[in-house]
Amino acid sequence: MSMSNFLFTSESVTEGHPDKVADQISDSILDAIITEDKTARVACETLVTTGLAFVAGEITTSSWVDIPDIIRSTIKGIGYNDSSMGFDWSTCAVITSIDKQSPDIAQGVNPGEGLFEEQGAGDQGLMFGFACNETPVFMPMPIYYAHRITRKLAEVRKNGVLEFLRPDGKSQVTVEYDDHRPKRIDTIVVAAQHAPNVSYSMIRESIIEEVIKKVFPPELIDDKTKYFINSTGRFVIGGPMGDCGLTGRKIIADTYGGQGSHGGGCFSGKDPSKVDRTASYMARYVAKNIVAAGVADKVEVQVAYSIGVAEPVSLMIDTFGTGKIPSDRIAEIVRKLFSFKPANMIKQLRLLRPIFKKTACYGHFGRNDPDFTWEKTDMVEPIRELAGI
């Protein structure tokens, strides 16, 4: 961005948003399979709509998992437990259509079967990682607080503080920047699905008091901050009844809220051999450690692949002018300390574990969870040593 003073907006959605229901189903199936078969190839897509969950994809595995049961238990855990919502775990129809992974793809991924000996990338493509020092978790402030709102909406719904809430919901946070640094919260937008017999005034007041005020530090909010709560006046029909949900439709909320770049590939339902997911996690790991090391205030890492080839075809580092050393020097350090070969990324980040369902809502990045190994900052000292800072 050329402007130094500007507004920037990011959004998040709750676990009951139809697209996120689909993501969680896809990743729940992946978790169940990877628990039994570490070598499985999974590409699992989900569609949810009124009274129906449809799962299709390409899965090659030696294990057997009860996909309909996984679908229903995931929906139940989210909170769709009443047929009046138009989508209910116990009564919705479940349809599956699963094929095996194409052998033409498999021979490029499986070690020793294609043109190259090493495990190759599962597809061509470009992936990005991003980090900045705006928040304690090295995420941009707008998406950081947007996720905190949606997590809080789910929390107060599930613990009974706001019993009138239903699972679907969205948030949007606009941050005012001054000289490229966050200054204040300009606008907060919340859409929260609710029971039909609740007044608008109660919904608005309750969300401001029990969600917004519990999420934002008072120094970021002022008398000019604008609130838009359920700004149509009513949000009763929601979830898969209100909108058809599909896996992979929330890739910006999944990543950095529109800051930085995105290669276009989604994450959910994909096993770790898919570089859309694994290389994006690795690029975040690299970017976060660079910023945590103090080498730059903001950094973006791009990596790209050819299908069946282990080594990336390109690696790019951009510090947006904030680097303490030149970007080409940072790239040299990255090449020395990190490997972007699929097998090495999977090993370093320990991705052959059933950890993916919890990545499927509230962001894949900026989470303080030990299972999110790509969020560790354990490479800070080696980076500092090579950077000479």
Curated annotation (Swiss-Prot):
Cofactor: Mg(2+); K(+)
Binding positions (Mg(2+)): D19
GO cellular component, one term: cytoplasm
Residue sites binding ATP per the record: H17, D168, G169, K170, R234, F235, D243, R249, K250, K270
Chain residue ranges for the region called Flexible loop: 101-111
Pfam name, any one: S-AdoMet_synt_N
Gene3D superfamilies the UniProt entry points to: 3.30.300.10
Binding-site residues, K(+): E45
Entry keyword annotation includes Transferase: yes
Primary localisation category: cytoplasm
Entry EC no(s): 2.5.1.6
Keywords for this protein: ATP-binding, Cytoplasm, Magnesium, Metal-binding, Nucleotide-binding, One-carbon metabolism, Potassium, Transferase
Catalytic activity: L-methionine + ATP + H2O = S-adenosyl-L-methionine + phosphate + diphosphate
Pathway listed: Amino-acid biosynthesis; S-adenosyl-L-methionine biosynthesis; S-adenosyl-L-methionine from L-methionine: step 1/1
Localization, UniProt: Cytoplasm
Cofactor note: Binds 2 divalent ions per subunit.
GO molecular function list: ATP binding; magnesium ion binding; methionine adenosyltransferase activity
Positions annotated to bind L-methionine: E58, Q101, D243, K274
InterPro entries in the record: ADOMET_SYNTHASE_CS, S-AdoMet_synt_C, S-AdoMet_synt_central, S-AdoMet_synt_N, S-AdoMet_synthetase, S-AdoMet_synthetase_sfam
GO BP, sorted A to Z: one-carbon metabolic process; S-adenosylmethionine biosynthetic process
Job description of the protein: Catalyzes the formation of S-adenosylmethionine (AdoMet) from methionine and ATP. The overall synthetic reaction is composed of two sequential steps, AdoMet formation and the subsequent tripolyphosphate hydrolysis which occurs prior to release of AdoMet from the enzyme.
Family of this protein: Belongs to the AdoMet synthase family.
Assembly behavior: Homotetramer; dimer of dimers.
Protein's UniProt name: S-adenosylmethionine synthase
Lineage, top ranks: Bacteria, Pseudomonadati, Thermodesulfobacteriota, Syntrophobacteria, Syntrophobacterales
Record gene name: metK
